[in-house]
Amino acid sequence: MLRVRCLRGGSRGAEAAHYIGSRLGRVFTGWVQRSFQSTQAATASQNACAADDKATSSVPKDCLVCSYNEWDPLEEVIVGRAENACVPPFSVEVKANTYEKYWGFYQKFGGQSFPKDHLKKAIAEIEEMCNILKREGVIVKRPDPIDWSVKYKTPDFESTGMYAAMPRDILLVVGSEIIEAPMAWRARFFEYRAYRRIIKDYFNHGAKWTTAPKPTMADELYDQDYPIRSVEDRHKLAAQGKFVTTEFEPCFDAADFIRAGRDIFVQRSQVTNYMGIEWMRRHLAPDYRVHVISFKDPNPMHIDATFNIIGPGLVLSNPDRPCHQIELFKKAGWTVIRPPVPLIPDEGSFSCV
């Protein structure tokens, strides 16, 4: 899901803390605690009245997109769909993010539809989620159904698609701006097409629309000899800061970023590199600060299941993937909650996330 609008009375400009870092990607050298800013002060520049010239006007007051954090009450949301979902081709970036015991599945079915019974169950679950949200008064929007089995080719690669099940991966809302992430998997290169109708509608209602530089996804973006066999291999590589994506060009998934008012936290992962983080930092500066954090995670990819900010100064931290910088949050007065380990085993998942 992707939250595009929250109640306007929330803590959309709140700052629980402020890092003073050294260079991007390095361990922070300082921490300064800041008090919460008021909603009015934080968003004054975001909600300026529209000028007569629409081509140069500020964001109108009735803009449908307005979300600054992960905890405000929800008004409107984009929920993905599993229809026509395809197994991604077994390329090196897919291999790096899947368990070895499932490699045979990807090798056999890559480029084909997922099993029908799997899709049927997934579609039913998503539809029920939409029904629950609607009953709670939330406006639900859905991406367009697309045939993801169609093969496409660029000067650098060819692939089939995957799905439009996870808008959180591809779209990031920062204030009144929607940012399309460039992605890092070749099978997700054209995934943005499923959301263009929705994004254009938000744009026509005042939202800012930004598309990050699209990577070529040439072979140079990936470590073709990335050594992965065991969990121990993954732990060792992650500890050394080695990932399947290189720094050949910027790439990132929106799901590696998490928002807390004017402070945005991000992890370097298998799909988000430092060039992508630096692009986002420069794009959002000076209004927002982007902080890199890291975890004891053998296969980092998407931050929500590892570290989630669920309220002002309130963090939900996965005990299996502790944050290396967690003491900085504690010193700044944040409350850190470590939930119990779930009873449901993780063995049923095709992905390492």
Give each language-model segment a name:
Residues 1-48:
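N-terminal mitochondrial targeting presequence
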Residues 31, 38-353:
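The feature marks the mature, well-folded catalytic cores of soluble enzymes
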